[in-house]
């Protein structure tokens, strides 16, 4: 296990592993739906700074090359949606992935294939069956990295990826509901052996310290001594959430997720201004709670035009107002009560609308705490707790409908968000 300050930082780690024991081969990185992963992932995937500062406090230039990484790394993007924002057929996606891997390997390049489990809107690709075929065909010429940063995945799935010699990226801050900026990479033994030789790219000293790497990782000896203690504490909190979640019976996990889905669909149906995105359950082998949909993206019809959906800028404005106490702008007690609530949901994802523009898709998702509970729920019976949670979920959509109906007034005063 190697700890990283975020899922994007772990992307640098995955690329660095492909430079060991030396960087003798040019690299092709294949990313799936980069618009549905972290915004900095495409830059990190080719060895470039993805922000203006780093986990170790270095000031850097965004998109500038990071020292020690090959400058000729090639990026290939495979979209998971068509120009209308609709998920592409799995067969088309997997054919494109297979062709991209084969073309890069034929050109004498080392290939890093990034599987996505899951995207910001709940998409999974490619299938485990394709990953097995690619591993059998290309062997050590192919590195597989699984972006499981959503952590909407059970331990048996993670084990199956590791058995394919895939590096699995995880975080503690999304499904697990731990503090933000807690990433890690799970490295299978065959890949971990690379850490015994060579040297990691020199520029990683801006992102990692020795304490985040196993003591046996000789390739990390050039990193600064010490550790990111804030990262360690954030993971301690996330692991506490994981332990409580793991203790919940599997059938109960599935029951709660199905109840959440029904609550989302009911809340959306109460208003005619929402469009719920159609996404299938994750196509996994076998059943289990992680084969159920837990992320629900929705769009909002624009004020004054039921034929148009909010674009990303307007959706982001609405997202900020959801996180603001807007009660002062309303008159009736009911409206003031709804407007006062702070509603924190998933930030909008920009997807194409088929006409050259984009739609901002907001998201609600089930987290581990919905299933396992948290300290403020102590003393509540499970059904009563869930009824309260589903009531809060319905209120999110009620507040959106209220804000939309007073859009011009809100735009005039623009209440500021306060995250608490």
Positions of predicted regions on the chain:
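Conserved PLP-enzyme active-site core in the AAT-like
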Residues: 2-7, 14-222
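Buried hydrophobic packing segments
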Residues: 10-18, 234-239, 393-399
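Low-complexity, serine/threonine/proline-enriched polar segments
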Residues: 39, 46-85, 227, 286-288, ...
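Short, flexible/disordered intra-domain loops and linkers
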Residues: 84-88, 245-252, 306-313, 373-388
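Active-site C-terminal subdomain of aminotransferase-like
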Residues: 173-289, 403
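Short beta-strand-to-loop capping motifs
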Residues: 187, 298-302, 366
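PLP-dependent enzyme catalytic core of the Aspartate aminotransferase-like
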Residues: 349-420
């Amino acid at each position: 296990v190697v700890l990283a300050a975020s899922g994007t930082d772990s992307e640098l780690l995955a690329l660095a592993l492909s430079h060991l024991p030396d960087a003798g081969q040019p690299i092709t990185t294949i990313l799936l739906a980069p618009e549905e992963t972290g915004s900095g992932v495409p830059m990190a995937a080719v060895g470039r700074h993805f922000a203006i500062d780093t986990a170790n406090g270095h000031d850097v230039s965004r998109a500038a090359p990071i020292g020690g990484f090959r400058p000729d790394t090639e990026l290939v993007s495979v979209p998971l949606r068509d120009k209308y924002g609709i998920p592409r057929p799995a067969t088309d996606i997997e054919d494109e992935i297979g062709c991209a891997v084969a073309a890069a390997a034929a050109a004498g390049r080392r290939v890093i294939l990034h599987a996505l489990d899951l995207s910001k809107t709940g998409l999974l690709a490619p299938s485990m069956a394709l990953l097995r075929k690619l591993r059998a065909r290309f062997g050590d010429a192919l590195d597989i990295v699984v972006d499981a940063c959503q952590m909407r995945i059970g331990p048996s799935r993670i084990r199956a990826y590791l058995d394919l010699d895939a590096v699995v990226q995880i975080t503690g801050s999304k499904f697990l509901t731990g503090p933000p900026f807690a990433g890690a990479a799970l490295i299978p033994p065959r890949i971990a052996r690379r850490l015994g030789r060579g040297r990691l790219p020199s520029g990683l000293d801006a992102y990692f310290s020795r304490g985040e790497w196993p003591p046996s990782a000789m390739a990390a000896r050039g990193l600064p001594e010490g550790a990111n203690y804030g990262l360690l504490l954030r993971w301690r909190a996330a692991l506490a959430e994981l332990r409580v979640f793991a203790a919940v019976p599997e059938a109960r996990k599935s029951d709660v997720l199905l109840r959440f889905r029904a609550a989302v669909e009911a809340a959306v149906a109460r208003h005619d201004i929402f469009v719920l995105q159609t996404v299938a359950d994750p196509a996994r082998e076998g059943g289990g709670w992680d084969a159920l949909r837990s992320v629900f993206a929705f769009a909002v019809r624009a004020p004054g035009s039921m034929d148009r959906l909010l674009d990303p800028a307007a959706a982001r404005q609405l997202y900020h107002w959801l996180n603001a106490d807007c009660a002062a702008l309303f008159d009736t007690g009911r409206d003031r009560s709804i407007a006062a609530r702070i509603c924190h949901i998933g930030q909008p994802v920009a997807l194409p609308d088929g006409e050259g523009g984009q739609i901002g898709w907001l998201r609600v998702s089930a987290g581990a705490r919905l299933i396992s509970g948290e300290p403020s729920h102590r003393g509540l019976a499970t059904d009563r707790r869930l009824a309260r949670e589903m009531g809060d979920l319905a209120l999110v959509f009620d507040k959106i409908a209220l804000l939309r109906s007073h859009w011009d007034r809100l735009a005039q005063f623009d209440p500021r968000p306060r995250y608490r």
